[in-house]
Amino acid sequence: DAEVVQSLTGCTVEEWTRLDEPLAPDTAARREGVSIPRVAEHAERVRGVADDRETVIVEGAGGLLVRLDTDGGTLLDLTADLARTHPVEVVVVVAAGLGTLNHTELTVGALRARGLEPTGLVVGSWPTEPDLAERCNLVDLPRVTGVPLLAVIPAGAGSMQPDEFVAAAPTWFDGTDRAEHPS
């Protein structure tokens, strides 16, 4: 992901932990026999980066409550830790299909339970031919969570050429590139 983001956007990317298998970080680290930094260590590194930049994006793998370290620390713990010292905006990236309403409501509920109000939702991989559930979810996600839908990113966006990506990305946030959906 880091190389793709950097090649498409030209943004500076720092990656502190890379694991070989596409699994929850704690699981992948255990399987590889490596230890990963504790959430508190990640928080300090993010603070160091945030002091020199206007915007910092922190991406996790597997979801808000997936363990990031052997102590049971999660992305939610990291976010709450950072929010104590820096302004934090949380954008929840969600799936398009059946089951996303449940997953998204659970994620938003967990954030709110820690005093973190999500800024918005982003559908992370919108199919070229969305089914009924996917189309309905565009309406239902903000309705059931009370959180606005900020963007719908098409499936395969990471495979675009950088100039194509830069030209298309604004349409993902203004809704002009979305398939029609039922209301």
Regions found by a protein language model. Name each.
Residues V108-S183:
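C-terminal lobe/tail of nucleotide-utilizing enzymes
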Residues D69-L78, E105-L106, E134-V139:
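Charged helix-capping and loop-helix junction motifs
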Residues D69-A96:
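Inter-motif core of Ras-like GTPase G domains
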Residues I57-E59, V91-V93, V122:
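Structural motif
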Residues L75-A83, N102-A113:
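Histidine-anchored nucleotide/phosphate-binding helix
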Residues L8-T9, L82, H86, V144-V147:
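Short, structured coil segments at secondary-structure junctions
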Residues H42, V46-T70:
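Switch II (G3) loop of P-loop NTPases
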Residues D1-A40, R45-G48:
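N-terminal phosphate/diphosphate-binding loop that engages ATP/GTP or pyrophosphate donors
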